[in-house]
């Protein structure tokens, strides 16, 4: 039921908050399955036709902030499957009044999550490795 709800979500969503326009997408504004890594070349972030102040995305689980020609691209990382360090939830705060983006890391106990992985799918070794980094 929850998975069906997630699968039914749109690839993108435009929202306004604090007088700023946000485009929310998973992989990139042009492809929900595209990986945009922090070390990608500048042309990888050259999207035309974006009508937003901020583009928020995920997919890679790596935190990044990149200024593009007309917008700021932000990947806060991952709350549950951070790629840089296990046991840390990555997230950010965007201050729409002064356009300051503050990247955050919050440690959490991975033991209950690993136990759930082992209980519900003992073949999920990759996720357990990610969580234990």
What are the roles of these predicted feature ranges?
Residues 1-54:
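Conserved catalytic scaffold of divalent metal-dependent phosphoesterases
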Residues 9-11, 60, 78-80:
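Glycine-rich, charged/polar anion/phosphate-binding loops
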Residues 10-14, 62-63, 89-91:
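Short, acidic/polar N-cap/turn motifs at the starts of alpha helices
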Residues 25, 54-59, 73-77:
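Active-site neighborhood of phospho(di)ester-bond hydrolases with catalytic His/Asp-centered motifs
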Residues 30-32, 56-67, 81-86:
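Active-site environment of divalent metal-dependent phosphoester hydrolases
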Residues 32-33, 37-40, 60-62, 123, ...:
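Charged, low-complexity, helix/coiled-coil-prone segments
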Residues 66-133:
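Acidic, His/Gly-rich catalytic cores of divalent-metal-dependent hydrolytic chemistry
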